[in-house]
Amino acid sequence: MLKIRLKRCGRKKQTSFKIVVMNNLDKRDGQAIEELGFMNPRTKEKYLNINKINHYLRLGAKPTKTVFDLLNKAKII
């Protein structure tokens, strides 16, 4: 089953997250199928590739709770 979730990246105590599509059995920092955007919680900067996100949602990918909240704020879902 595909999940749209956050993948941690960045330096220690300066984290940022990539929004990726992964198999739900893979590790959090494992290999992603595709990157859909990024989010930096420290600077509130974020980028979402809406076309790719909608494509994977149509294929049946389920967003995690945090990603679901991000998509709601961006009015994608």
Swiss-Prot record:
SUPFAM superfamilies: Ribosomal protein S16
Alphabetic keyword roster: Chloroplast, Plastid, Ribonucleoprotein, Ribosomal protein
Main location class: plastid
Protein location: Plastid, Chloroplast
Sequence similarity: Belongs to the bacterial ribosomal protein bS16 family.
Chloroplast recorded as keyword: yes
HAMAP family listed in its UniProt record: Ribosomal_bS16
GO biological process: mitochondrial translation
Extra remark beyond the main annotation: Although originally identified as Cyanidium caldarium, these sequences derive from Galdieria sulphuraria.
Upper lineage: Eukaryota, Rhodophyta, Bangiophyceae, Galdieriales, Galdieriaceae
Pfam families (UniProt xref): Ribosomal_S16
GO cellular component: chloroplast; mitochondrion; small ribosomal subunit
Organism of origin: Galdieria sulphuraria
Molecular-function GO term, any one: structural constituent of ribosome
Protein name in UniProt: Small ribosomal subunit protein bS16c
Keyword field contains Iron: no
